[in-house]
Amino acid sequence: RPASYTGVDKDPVAAKHVRELVGTRGTVINADASDTGLESGAADVVVGEAMLTMQGEKSKKAIISEAVRLLAPGGRYAIHELAVQPDTIDEELHTQIRKDLARAIHVNARPLTCAQWSQLLEECGLVVDSVHTAPMALLDFSRNIRDEGFMQTLRIIRNVLSDRELRARVLGMRKTFRTYQQWMCGVAIVAHKPLKGEDHDAQ
């Protein structure tokens, strides 16, 4: 069990809300993930949840580099992101998925292949330890119940049904995810910051 937890959120309202939920069990700061202001080398583990997919290449690298700065040598960085598959996917199809996804969720999402995610982490100085994928189930009802609980899922559905604009957006997202379901997946990658003298290319 970690000695302490520190959460980082760029949205001050979200940071305040999580801070109230966490209470004395951890710390939550309002900061950018690419420039947290936290102490270098003080973290044993850094976790990024569905954050990098929504960033451009420059921002992706900035956030990962900040995670590397925060980690002590041997510390681990774990990410959970959206990926496209297979690694040999046609570039034209990959581009079309990115465009349609960005149009559906109103964010310039840029999912990578699993190989590209691993390469990005390695370019920032990390050693990839494991890569695991799972079917894309972001808007799957049964998955939502497992993740959020029955009552919370009902509240989400109520909010969606009562807001025409939100409803149209969610339905658009669902349609896009279903259209490209066979080429999209969730990916979880764990990498570590090399120890002094460790071969960066060692897997």
Where are these regions (language model features)?
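Class I SAM-dependent methyltransferase SAM/SAH-binding core
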Residues: 1-36
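A short acidic, Gly/Pro-enriched loop at the edge of an enzyme's catalytic core
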Residues: 34-46
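Conserved class I S-adenosyl-L-methionine
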Residues: 77-100
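Short alpha-helix
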Residues: 108-125
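Conserved Class I S-adenosyl-L-methionine
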Residues: 130-203
